[in-house]
Amino acid sequence: MSSLPLLIHTKYLAFEWGKSTVDYFRKYAAKHGLDLFVFHEPEVIDIVQCQGYVIVSGVDLLWLKHVVTELEPLKLQIVLLNGELWNYRENISHIIFDQKSLLRNSLEVLHRHNRTNTAFFGALKHDTSDAVKENYFADCFQWDDIYSITDSIEDCFAQFWRKAAQYDSVICANDGIAVYFMQRCFANGLSIPEDLYLIGNGNLWLSSHVTPTISTAAYDRKSMTEVTAQICGLTTANTSISSIDVFMKATVIERASTGAFTDSVMMNNEYLYPYNPAEHGILSLDIPPEIHHIQTLSQIFSSCSSQQLEIYRQLVNGESYQTISDAVYITVDAVKYHVKKIYKLLDIHSRKELCTLLDHYRIVL
């Protein structure tokens, strides 16, 4: 791998996360002696410069679908950066997955293939999403059949390998873990799926459109860049991989009268545009009693993403929902959701009240 081909739409460069994505890749390329090629539309991609894969960055699902359609004839492997999607979910209280249905579907697949001795592999300790998966799995099987990553994934696999003979199937916590698990099995002489039937629980949008895929996570934009570059090396060595999803973990803040705490969760793209929060498993925020204190207000707005701040700026400037939607590249319903959320959080009911509140405390968005 001697190049890093990055496809990022021009309009995303107007946002801080878009600029920082390009900056981090530029720094990484310079540090490791790689050539960074930045494209803004799939139609202008140079196959020679891509060397078989392309990194795609964007939040607009319609644009992403367009990219997949355009790149499919080129047989390029897609590395999809979904880190920026977290900006839509920085200040909600929780995200709930339907992990029970996911596990049930996995078990139905195994049942159809007469696989009944199943292990759950690769769950990260202290990861909210993986903990939910573990609990649902334990309801169906035994805790002894769950192999979690406490120190390293190598130690986790070694623990599993000592008891591997008693299993005919494995459900992995995510697709990235599944690829690692598959490689280790091949190295140890096991055949997939003849000896072990393997299921990887992928989470992201592209996973349902292009298969097989890898999903992996990073903790900030710098580590996301490093993970992406490492994964790109894997794609060039394994042509059976069609796509890879690289995304960041979110810091989720719950504000309540009893205090505040942070947690980490993982997100499914189907929650990107919530029309009804209750239907999407999103819990509403409790309103702090000291909400109108200037320090609390400053903290609220400082924790907002660049997209959210742009929504509020345009709202204060009197722009219509459609104009705001066009400016920040999300649906009108998504804009309305963000507006209603900030109204509820600030205990106000109109655009005029928001303007009055900001003027009173001299807060500039």
Enumerate the language-model features and the residues they cover.
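An alpha-beta-alpha
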Residues: 104-144, 244-260
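Recognition helix of helix-turn-helix DNA-binding domains
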Residues: 318-353
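Short alpha-helical "packing" element that flanks the helix-turn-helix/winged-helix DNA-binding module
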Residues: 308-315, 354
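Regulatory hinge/linker segments at domain boundaries
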Residues: 285-306
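Alpha-helical recognition/docking segments in bacterial nutrient-uptake
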Residues: 1-108, 164
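Flexible loop/turn connectors
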Residues: 92, 162-172, 176-177, 182-267
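Hydrophobic alpha-helical segments within soluble ligand-binding/sensing domains
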Residues: 85, 93-120, 153-158, 178, ...
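Short, basic, alpha-helical segments at the C-terminal edge of helix-turn-helix-like DNA-binding modules
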Residues: 348-364
